[in-house]
Swiss-Prot record:
It comes from Prochlorococcus marinus (strain MIT 9303). Belongs to the universal ribosomal protein uS13 family. Signal peptide: none annotated. This is Small ribosomal subunit protein uS13. Keywords: Ribonucleoprotein, Ribosomal protein, RNA-binding, rRNA-binding, tRNA-binding. The gene is rpsM.
């Protein structure tokens, strides 16, 4: 397995697909990186030469990926919560953030149903 950006890339996959195992890199960005670095996207990771791996590493330095990206996203959410805006409060309460209804639906975000004791008649 080649190790790029702190991630073990699967050996038997094409380079184009293997790069998507890195957090922050999808198929479109992987194609862009391969084009810039001049690496053939159709070869397998196990067939890459050391020079090709080094080219990929230098091309990846231009992007925010892995731990830096996770930290950046976490800081953005924390900032919203700290300033007390509606989006931050909704994140804190684990409710939908973008204006969706919650009287029905929103089960994924709200979690499993909690039984509330009803009044007896």
């Amino acid at each position: 397995m080649a190790r790029i950006a702190g991630v073990d890339i699967p050996r038997d996959k094409r380079v184009e697909v293997a790069l998507t195992y890195i957090y922050g890199i999808g198929l479109t960005r992987a194609k862009t990186i391969l084009t810039k670095s001049g690496v053939n996207p159709d070869i397998r990771v196990k067939d890459l030469e050391d020079g090709d791996v080094q080219k990929l590493r230098t091309a990846l330095e231009a992007f925010t990926i892995e731990g830096d990206l996770r930290r950046q996203e976490g800081m953005a959410l924390k900032r919203l919560q700290d300033i007390g805006c509606l989006r931050g409060r909704r994140h804190r309460m684990s409710l939908p953030v973008r204006g969706q209804r919650t009287r029905t639906n929103a089960r994924t975000r709200r979690g499993a149903r909690k039984t509330v004791a009803g009044k007896k008649k």
